[in-house]
């Protein structure tokens, strides 16, 4: 009954799989947008990367500068003009023969943040040609998965956690 509403709360990079949240009412959308903008959400990603990072777990802090012509972000260790601070925390889930699986907790949500920051420590994501992996995946995806998203329900004020299953081909 009545009009149907669906508002986009956040986005994922095109080749990324996983959780995405939509608001079902026009009242919920600005509330959810605010919780994302104020970093009141907890975002967990899984990635398969080429090399083992220097530490089994760490916090990466960079200043990302976006190049719109290339649709790419560059990670800098020091602040540069027009850059934005980017913070993520990672730990190793599993070491495989050729790859390493990481769990990433995203503190900020910048353009291509995980991709740029992991590439900056010589850990490009499997299939991600743009950020230094040597070959693409057959389907054009990258091995970056938005695994879990926790946030406060915009009306009920209860914590919600949504977990996305891992794609079968991973």
Where are these regions (language model features)?
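RNA pseudouridine synthases
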Residues: 1-170
């Amino acid at each position: 009954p009545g009009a149907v509403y669906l508002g986009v709360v956040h986005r994922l990079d095109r080749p990324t799989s996983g959780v995405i949240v939509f608001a079902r009412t026009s009242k919920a959308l600005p509330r959810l947008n605010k919780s994302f903008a104020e970093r009141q959400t907890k975002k967990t990603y899984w990635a398969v990367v080429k090399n083992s990072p220097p530490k089994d777990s760490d916090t990466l802090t960079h200043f990302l500068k976006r190049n719109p012509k290339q649709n790419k972000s560059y990670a800098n260790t020091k602040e540069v003009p027009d850059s934005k601070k980017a913070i993520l925390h990672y730990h190793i889930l599993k070491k495989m023969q050729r790859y390493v699986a990481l769990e990433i907790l995203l503190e900020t949500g910048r353009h291509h943040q995980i991709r740029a920051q992991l590439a900056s420590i010589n850990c490009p994501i499997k299939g991600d040609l743009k950020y230094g992996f040597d070959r693409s995946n057959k389907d054009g995806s990258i091995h970056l998965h938005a695994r879990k998203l926790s946030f406060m329900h915009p009306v009920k004020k209860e914590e919600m956690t949504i977990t996305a299953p891992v794609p079968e081909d991973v």
